[in-house]
Curated annotation (Swiss-Prot):
Effect of H265A: 3800-fold decrease in activity
Keyword set, alphabetical order: Hydrolase, Iron, Lipid A biosynthesis, Lipid biosynthesis, Lipid metabolism, Metal-binding, Zinc
Its job: Catalyzes the hydrolysis of UDP-3-O-myristoyl-N-acetylglucosamine to form UDP-3-O-myristoylglucosamine and acetate, the committed step in lipid A biosynthesis.
Organism: Escherichia coli (strain K12)
Domain notes: The N-terminus is required for deacetylase activity. The C-terminus contains a signal sequence necessary for FtsH-dependent degradation.
Protein name: UDP-3-O-acyl-N-acetylglucosamine deacetylase
Required co-factors: Zn(2+); Fe(2+)
Binding site for Zn(2+): H79, H238, D242
Annotated active site: H265 (proton donor)
Mutagenesis or variant effect for H79A: 2300-fold decrease in activity
Catalysed reactions listed for this entry: a UDP-3-O-[(3R)-3-hydroxyacyl]-N-acetyl-alpha-D-glucosamine + H2O = a UDP-3-O-[(3R)-3-hydroxyacyl]-alpha-D-glucosamine + acetate
Additional information: Due to its important role in lipid A synthesis, LpxC is an attractive target for the development of new antibacterial agents to treat Gram-negative infections. Many potent LpxC inhibitors with a variety of chemical scaffolds and distinct antibiotic profiles have been discovered.
UniProt gene name: lpxC
Family recorded in the similarity comment: Belongs to the LpxC family.
Length: 305
């Protein structure tokens, strides 16, 4: 039986909030089978839980938030959610003593390291996957995103940024997902933004944690970070990282082929909601035998060591 995963032990890290610029303590806790992914704000009394749920997602200019029925929100969840998807973590409680998850270096890599440091534990309960049965597509002007049936998890993402720092040959990235491929090829890709936008937001008391330490920063001509890019195509790789996190908002790894053109958090979420709303387009599946499991979800040695 392919089993659900959680953490072996509690781990903690500190970072800076993208919005407030203040120190945030992040605590990751193991959780029992069928708990799902729960984000929790401990700065509120009593603490407020936000279960990962496609219908609770709100996309703001700066980040992805989860919002509850009382309009209370937790912000900047997307990169940690991508790390959970990458390592196939089904059950976890994520606590922060702030309204947001720390931005760390703007990628998912610090969260991957934290999860691996906690260790991955298998629970004696079958892991549920969402398997795509029919093609579902959503559009917004010339932007689109779609899922097709596929025995694995493949991603094909194209951006269209007209900027001197982004070569036209580096605007598309495609991969067959696996935990190893995610860790090596995607997790280290950082978010990005224009210097002028960051300066404008900070002048209005927003994005106070934004800096060269947590993003690729560009002006009209070039990348301003001293160390440059981690990959020539880091921009599109980060958009794929975002998509992996967005699509895991249903709390389950997806078996299907994802293709997107100029998509972002809002359209990725619209696709996920469109799939889930169409009952005949998907099904829950479990696997009794490792041999039946798509290669995409075979546990790498690093994860279950």
């Amino acid at each position: 039986m392919i089993k659900q995963r959680t953490l072996k032990r509690i781990v903690q890290a500190t970072g800076v909030g993208l919005h407030t610029g203040k120190k945030v303590t992040l605590t990751l806790r193991p959780a029992p089978a069928n708990t799902g992914v729960i984000y929790r704000r401990t700065d509120l009394n009593p603490p407020v839980d936000f279960p990962a749920d496609a219908k609770s997602v709100r996309d703001t200019m700066l980040c992805t938030c989860l919002v509850n029925e009382h309009d209370v929100r937790i912000s900047t969840v997307e990169h940690l959610n991508a790390a959970l998807a990458g390592l196939g973590i089904d059950n976890i409680v994520i606590e922060v003593n702030a309204p947001e998850i720390p931005i760390m270096d703007g990628s998912a890599a610090p969260f991957v390291y934290l999860l691996l440091d906690a260790g991955i534990d298998e629970l004696n309960c079958a892991k549920k996957f969402v398997r795509i049965k029919e093609t579902v597509r959503v559009e917004d002007g010339d932007k689109w995103a779609e899922f097709k049936p596929y025995n694995g998890f493949s991603l094909d993402f194209t951006i269209d940024f007209n900027h001197p720092a982004i070569d036209s040959s580096n605007q598309r990235y495609a991969m067959n997902f696996s935990a190893d491929a995610f860790m090596r090829q995607i997790s280290r890709a950082r978010t990005f933004g224009f210097m002028r936008d960051i300066e404008y937001l900070q002048s209005r008391g927003l994005c106070l944690g934004g800096s060269f330490d947590c993003a690729i920063v560009v002006d009209d001509y070039r990348v301003l970070n001293e160390d440059g890019l981690r990959f020539e195509d880091e921009f599109v790789r980060h958009k794929m990282l975002d998509a992996i996190g967005d699509l895991f908002m249903c709390g389950h790894n997806i078996i299907g082929a994802f293709t997107a053109y100029k998509s972002g958090h809002a359209l990725n979420n619209k696709l996920l909601q469109a799939v889930l709303a169409k009952q005949e387009a998907w099904e829950y599946v479990t696997f009794q035998d490792d041999a039946e499991l798509p290669l995409a979800f075979k546990a790498p040695s690093a994860v279950l060591a």
